[in-house]
């Protein structure tokens, strides 16, 4: 009958065109679980005659500023392209990984300074005759546990510090 497609259908159509009838990971904000993702699943499974639309769903919490959700309507959004003019993408990525994806992340200057300092420390250690080492399964373990990036970063801190200390213990002066 008369009408227009809803936004759920737009996403199903884009997913099918770009990723196929079934794909591995579908993501979005926690605010999209219902009704958007539920409708996407229902119509995609029916249209494609499949049991599965996406194998894994990742619903992230919000990035906030001063504990307020970023939103265009509130005028408090930050654009990555603007940040890239001020700092490296590595700092931005480390900042985004500093909180579990299902936990809110408050975006602020302290967070960015801490991430910049962490990266500087890692780079200094690498430049200080640091030899690459294989990342152990123990260090990676948090990643396999619901993409626990803060746990992985903590393990990486410990590993980098320990490896750096060991390198200095065996060095001749």
What are these regions (language model features)?
Residues 163-172:
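Conserved small/polar residues in nucleotide/adenosyl-binding loops
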Residues 33, 89-91, 96-97, 144, ...:
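Non-catalytic interaction-recognition regions
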Residues 1-130:
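Alpha-helical recognition segments enriched in aromatics with Gly/Pro capping
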